[in-house]
């Protein structure tokens, strides 16, 4: 125990030195705590304060905010994380804070820890026992919290199965998305990723490792799923799987009228009287603002629109005097032995009742893996063009279905029409509230409406215009507030306690009680700015 306190003293001293002298570097923690002993994270080199470790951990995908940690832990196993948290909890006085970094894909510093410790979760993925395992009966997959969803997919496909619910981008960690919710086009029928978790291993703010599920330690299970890293870190998740299809017919349908677009989207996600759903396994949508950037936006949409197709859509918008056009994106999955004619017939039948513009249906046939990992190719192209590592002032909202037309008029046909250039996709699609578990920490719009929309305005500041884009986001939120649109922010970041209280609404008191129970010293995930 004496060695642990030497570790704490060294860390606090390092943090104070950084605060006093700036971010010019750090002193190796092992030098401050020279006594070697089994499990000493500092002496083993796993806990580092050098700039090569701390500077990369001070930034995230958003490229908007930065916060230098005092140290970074590179754990070899969950036991190293537990040791760090036990040491932090046992520290006298005001302990250091701890955050958990997967791919660093937060946009507003949610995974940063100014003057604290950032845990580099992906360090647990190297060596040792496999951290992704499909059950013998093919019912579930166990995955380490540090594992990427794309690797979970590949391991599961090798056994002929796959998780049911995804995010659009698979190069994120299991623990990262489950700490938020994890939404995509499958959410309408299977719920978010958190609704598909069977069991977790969690290390709490006490440094205690707990296995939890709906049957055992259910309060912690519900707290952690969608809990923004406030109650513990997920080191293992058991996720339900289903038989994996071989291929997908990937369809895009173009609309010039928002009412027809949203009505068809809601028709596609509506459950039948027996609770089942239609043949579409994935339903999303996109908005393309008319104007000089319309053709470029269309041609960057997954290869669906050729130059000639884009020109036709531009002409359609002009003929209808439309300020925006809309596209439903959907997939129909099928087996390897399905014939092209049978797939064509199934798609034709599924499209029969829809009201898209005649002649404006586009499709591709792809492997199931190619579809799910579709965004990665776009990332590679943007990376090569130097447009990936730019500021990303994203705005993600859950909007009640009854108010989505008001949002369209006020935002897509209003505020965004004054923007000089829009770089980044504008995504919009409905999901069913009944597929979400109200006991979990994630929040959805209040009220009894079954349908709400996921709206993701994924702006990229490619023209050094991040301040203007952030101001635009504030205008959008102010419009929603003044119009009484009862939205909830997804992947939220607020600067005041009052905003967080409003965000959680009826869940706030329970959220606070759970924080006091599982992280009473407020050690975990300080970058969320909820309790710190």
UniProtKB/Swiss-Prot annotation:
It catalyses: N(6)-dimethylallyladenine + A + H2O = 3-methyl-2-butenal + adenine + AH2. Glycans are attached at residues 52, 63, 133, 321, 432. SUPFAM superfamilies: FAD-binding/transporter-associated domain-like, FAD-linked oxidases, C-terminal domain. PROSITE patterns: FAD_PCMH, OX2_COVAL_FAD. FAD binds at residues 100, 102-104, 106, 110, 168, 173, 179, 183, 234, 490, 525, 528. Transmembrane segments: none annotated. The modification Pros-8alpha-FAD histidine is found at residue 105. This is Cytokinin dehydrogenase 1. It comes from Oryza sativa subsp. japonica (Rice).
């Amino acid at each position: 125990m004496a060695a642990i306190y030497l570790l704490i003293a060294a860390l606090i001293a390092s943090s104070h030195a950084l605060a006093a002298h700036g971010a010019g570097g750090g002193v190796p923690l092992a030098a401050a705590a020279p006594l070697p002993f089994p499990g000493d994270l500092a002496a083993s080199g796993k806990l580092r304060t050098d700039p090569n470790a701390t500077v990369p951990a001070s930034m995230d995908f958003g490229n908007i905010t930065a916060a230098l940690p005092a140290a970074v832990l590179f754990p070899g196993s969950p036991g190293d994380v537990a040791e760090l948290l036990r040491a932090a909890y046992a520290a006298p006085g005001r302990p250091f804070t701890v955050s958990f970094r997967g791919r660093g894909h937060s946009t507003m510093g949610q995974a940063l820890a100014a003057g604290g410790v950032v845990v580099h979760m992906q360090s647990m993925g190297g060596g040792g026992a496999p951290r992704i395992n499909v059950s013998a009966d093919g019912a579930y997959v166990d995955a380490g919290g540090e594992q990427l969803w794309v690797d979970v997919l590949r391991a599961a496909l090798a056994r002929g199965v796959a998780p049911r619910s995804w995010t659009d981008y698979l190069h994120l960690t299991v623990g990262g998305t489950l700490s938020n919710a994890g939404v995509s086009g499958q959410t309408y029928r299977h719920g978010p990723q958190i609704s598909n978790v069977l069991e977790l291993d969690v290390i709490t703010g006490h440094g205690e490792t707990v296995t939890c599920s709906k049957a055992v330690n259910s309060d912690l299970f519900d707290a952690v799923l969608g809990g923004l890293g406030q109650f513990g870190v997920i080191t293992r998740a058991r996720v339900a799987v289903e038989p994996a299809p071989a291929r997908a017919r990937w369809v895009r349908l173009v609309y010039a009228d928002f009412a027809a677009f949203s009505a068809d989207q809601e028709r596609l996600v509506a459950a039948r009287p027996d609770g089942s759903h239609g043949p579409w396994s994935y339903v999303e949508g996109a908005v393309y603002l008319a104007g000089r950037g319309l053709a470029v936006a269309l041609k960057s949409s997954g290869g669906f629109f050729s130059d000639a197709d884009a020109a036709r859509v531009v002409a359609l918008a002009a003929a209808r005097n439309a300020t925006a056009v809309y596209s439903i994106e959907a997939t129909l999955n099928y087996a390897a032995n399905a014939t092209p004619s049978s797939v064509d017939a199934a798609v034709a039948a599924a499209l029969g009742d829809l009201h898209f513009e005649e002649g404006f249906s586009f499709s591709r046939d792809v492997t199931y893996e190619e579809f799910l990992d579709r965004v990665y190719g776009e990332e590679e192209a943007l990376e090569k063009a130097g447009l990936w590592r730019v500021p990303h002032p994203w705005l993600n909202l859950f909007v009640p279905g009854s108010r989505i037309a008001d949002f369209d008029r006020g935002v897509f046909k209003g505020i965004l029409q004054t923007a000089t250039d829009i770089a980044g996709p504008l995504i919009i699609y409905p999901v069913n509230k009944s597929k979400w578990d109200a006991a979990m920490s994630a929040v959805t719009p209040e009220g009894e409406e079954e349908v709400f929309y996921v709206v993701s305005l994924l702006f990229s500041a490619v023209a050094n215009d991040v301040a203007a884009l952030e101001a635009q986001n504030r205008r959008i939120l102010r419009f929603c507030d003044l119009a009484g649109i009862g939205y909830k922010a997804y992947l939220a970041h607020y600067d005041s306690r009052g905003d967080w209280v409003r965000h959680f609404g009826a869940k706030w008191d329970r959220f606070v009680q759970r924080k006091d129970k599982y992280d009473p010293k407020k050690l975990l995930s300080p970058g969320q700015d909820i309790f710190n």
